[in-house]
Amino acid sequence: MEGFVNRFIRYVKKNTRSDASKAGVVIPSTASQMEFLEELYKELKEIGLEDVKINKNNAFLTATVPANTDNAPVIGFISHVDTADFNAENISPQIHENYDGGDIALGNSGFVLSPKEFPNLKNYIGQTLITTDGTTLLGADDKAGVCEIVSAMEYLINNPQIKHGKLRIAFG
């Protein structure tokens, strides 16, 4: 089972930048988005999800974790794989373990995340933070969602003692 942080880093390094000039004309707006969906297809099959399908007409991947108990509702989880129309080549995430509450330099870009400007950073003292190096976007919107969903489904498949109804997922 791949660790959450490693999976997240692997996902955000994938360039799935949107192309605003193709919005509403081509779905998905870039070929790299479909490539990422195809990689997710393989990963979901390997993890053990069922009914894994990609609809190439609308660029949606769907899959199922079967129920392991009766009388539980079907629950769906949805996330998108495209990222903002901003530099997404050579993404270099930075991992800041045990955040100390101070400024966070974003690589050598000259950009800094400061608790003076972002006071909510103080809520994360002692935690691990993952940021961009300042030269690209990180792509956490919404590869964090994709990572959370895939990791949760893998956990439930590997821990059948946790009872649940049918779980459906969709990525697009």
Can you name each region flagged by the protein language model?
Residues K22-A72, G76-I78, D82:
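A non-catalytic alpha/beta surface segment that caps or lines the substrate-entry region
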Residues F60-A63, K166-G172:
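Beta-rich nucleic-acid/ligand-interaction surfaces
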Residues E2-T30, I130-T131:
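N-terminal capping segment at the start of a domain
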Residues A72-I162, F171:
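Active-site metal-coordination/substrate-binding segment of hydrolases
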Residues R7-R10, E39, E148-S151, Y155:
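Alpha-helical scaffold segments in soluble metabolic enzymes
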Residues E2, M34, E38, K143-V146:
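Electropositive phosphate-/nucleotide-binding environments in soluble metabolic enzymes
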Residues A20, D51-K53, Q161-K166:
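Flexible, glycine/charged-enriched surface loops at secondary-structure junctions
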